[in-house]
């Protein structure tokens, strides 16, 4: 696997592949990789001739008092895992490479509406940072296909909307959430959990499952939401949000809607965990 922090190196290699008529997949990450990331890379390797991965802890998507400085950097272990998974080109830029003028002078991309609810309401500016860096990375790598995890459901819809609105010639593929045996969604932030917190963490997925089951049995959105919140508090969580939305638009779900997604963010100790459950009724 080739590793470079320089934009020109990435473009040169991708151009060489394209000159031979070969396809390029891209998996953007912030590093500290787990099996969920590796699954994205393996899926990408099956879909395209070549796989490019980026590791960049993006300062633009972190708010004040968030965990930018504490976010784990594990490049050596990540590189080894990516090589085994089938990645051929790893882009490891610095903030100065991505934002040479600094954040205050950076042109940004903002996806209105869908970026302003749920995590966007709890973390103002977060999706501006996500959309901006992903757009920049797409312009640098110029992939045919890009892979993202369904665990970050709102992020996936933000990126799909950005690609559609800006007419970017990139196919966006969402990959199912990878979970630990307990049901806990794999996340780089699971490392913040203590042993006792990790034992309690599967209650988040169980709450979503119970909500979906209740809705299918005819319970109201309000009933299942209150029951789920109570179960989360009992397990030691402090919910940030727990909402039922239209699966395609993230608009507030209506009783007649068939395509639904339950989205949750909740604090457990120092960790802010997110999860979702997409279902039809």
Curated annotation (Swiss-Prot):
Enzyme Commission number(s) from the entry: 6.3.2.1
Pathway: Cofactor biosynthesis; (R)-pantothenate biosynthesis; (R)-pantothenate from (R)-pantoate and beta-alanine: step 1/1
Catalytic reaction(s) noted: (R)-pantoate + beta-alanine + ATP = (R)-pantothenate + AMP + diphosphate + H(+)
UniProt entry keywords in alphabetical sequence: ATP-binding, Cytoplasm, Ligase, Nucleotide-binding, Pantothenate biosynthesis
GO BP terms, alphabetized: pantothenate biosynthetic process
SUPFAM superfamilies recorded: Nucleotidylyl transferase
Family matches, as Pfam families: Pantoate_ligase
Record flagged with keyword ATP-binding: yes
Key word Cytoplasm present: yes
One term under GO cellular component: cytosol
Compartment(s): Cytoplasm
Something else known: The reaction proceeds by a bi uni uni bi ping pong mechanism.
Complexes and interactors: Homodimer.
Functional summary from the UniProt entry: Catalyzes the condensation of pantoate with beta-alanine in an ATP-dependent reaction via a pantoyl-adenylate intermediate.
The protein's name in its UniProt record: Pantothenate synthetase
Native source organism of the sequence: Shewanella sp. (strain W3-18-1)
